[in-house]
């Protein structure tokens, strides 16, 4: 059955709210300015049971997916019409993390090949293979991996089947930071991409037996040790 595009936006933007927004085009704060971004999930099909998520696997709800090429075309058109300045692309985990990441990269690769030089914020998946990070960093202006929690105990409560906190998310975030640092030594880079806007992450606050001090400690480590731009 054919699904109208506006209905697809309506459902995919629900999932995108877990990345700080409830609408597909929203005003992001950047260096004292408001930047309109197109924000969406690539798919709402998910295999995981994260306690806070509207699209957890066991929940009965409509499931939608964008084809990478189509999403790239829509983004390019909105950018040319000056309705947006960038794309924030995240996703639920369908099949496995590598599969989803390949589809994300297919989307942003197509967008860059269309001549798009606007902002791209790419949210990478937990457990994803490190060899995807280099291309993601080259294509996107900001990249990140969601920690979801300040420590492994809270993570296990929130994300019981998402892998281990240290291995699946924290190590991936450290890998991203390491790969971004490697690109800083390169002298010939375009004016877009190459994670020029840095690395970010997010944590869910108050959905488990967490406390403010845990989040403060972890946030301090993220900013001072890893050098993240936003938590």
Name each model feature, range by range.
Residues 1-48:
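Flexible, acidic/Gly-rich N-terminal and inter-domain linker regions that tether
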Residues 37, 50, 89, 145, ...:
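Conserved, mostly hydrophobic/aromatic
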Residues 40-69:
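Canonical Radical SAM [4Fe-4S] cluster-binding loop centered on the CxxxCxxC motif
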Residues 48-52, 83, 148:
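Residues forming anionic-ligand binding surfaces in small-molecule and nucleic-acid pockets
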Residues 53, 86-89, 143-145, 231:
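Hydrophobic residues within beta-strands of alpha/beta enzymes
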Residues 55-61, 87-97, 120:
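Short acidic, glycine/Ser/Thr-rich loop/turn "cap" segments at secondary-structure junctions
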Residues 72, 95-231:
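Conserved AdoMet/S-adenosylmethionine-binding subsite of the radical SAM
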Residues 74-92:
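Short Fe-S-cluster ligation motifs
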